[in-house]
């Protein structure tokens, strides 16, 4: 296994439902170090830029609207095999298909309001981390 970084978002519904602490506790219990974190409220332009790969898809406008509907938490997680392990604890994108005990099974409200986002590959993690964090905002602890 390799020490990796992955990017994570706690989405507006989970922030509004006061689930930040519970989700952070799950990250730390799973062996992740949270090496960068901040709360922000995305502008339409920021959301469209972040999700640019989905532009033109039927769900794009709804996703942008949801992601700009309230504050989010963005964080960088570091740990062994971080990208895949984070995806495993998030659960299936559709919370109806998420295994019990996963973040989406426990905190999602719907397919769009599915509580969390996580990078799908090391390369996308690097791109997503750089979208929200400068190098001097990341503090490795390992």
UniProtKB/Swiss-Prot annotation:
EC number: 2.7.4.6
Keywords: ATP-binding, Cytoplasm, Kinase, Magnesium, Metal-binding, Nucleotide metabolism, Nucleotide-binding, Phosphoprotein, Transferase
Pfam family, one: NDK
Classification via InterPro entries: NDK-like_dom, NDK-like_dom_sf, Nucleoside_diP_kinase, Nucleoside_diP_kinase_AS
Biological process annotations from GO: CTP biosynthetic process; GTP biosynthetic process; UTP biosynthetic process
Keyword 4Fe-4S: no
UniProt function note: Major role in the synthesis of nucleoside triphosphates other than ATP. The ATP gamma phosphate is transferred to the NDP beta phosphate via a ping-pong mechanism, using a phosphorylated active-site intermediate.
Name listed for the protein in its UniProt record: Nucleoside diphosphate kinase
Species of provenance: Yersinia pseudotuberculosis serotype O:1b (strain IP 31758)
Taxonomic lineage: Bacteria, Pseudomonadati, Pseudomonadota, Gammaproteobacteria, Enterobacterales
Gene it is expressed from: ndk
């Amino acid at each position: 296994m390799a020490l990796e970084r992955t990017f994570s978002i706690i989405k507006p519904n989970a922030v509004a439902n006061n689930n930040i602490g519970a989700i952070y506790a799950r990250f730390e219990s799973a062996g992740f170090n949270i090496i960068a974190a901040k709360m922000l409220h995305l502008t339409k332009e920021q959301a469209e830029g972040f999700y640019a790969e989905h532009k033109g898809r039927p769900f794009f406008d709804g996703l942008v609207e949801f992601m700009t509907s309230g504050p989010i938490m963005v964080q960088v997680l570091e740990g062994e095999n971080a990208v895949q392990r984070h995806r495993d604890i998030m659960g299936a994108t559709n919370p109806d298909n998420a295994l019990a005990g996963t973040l989406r099974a426990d905190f999602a409200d719907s397919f769009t309001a599915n509580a969390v986002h996580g990078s799908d590959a090391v390369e996308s993690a690097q791109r997503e981390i750089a979208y929200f964090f400068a190098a001097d905002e990341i503090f490795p602890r390992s």
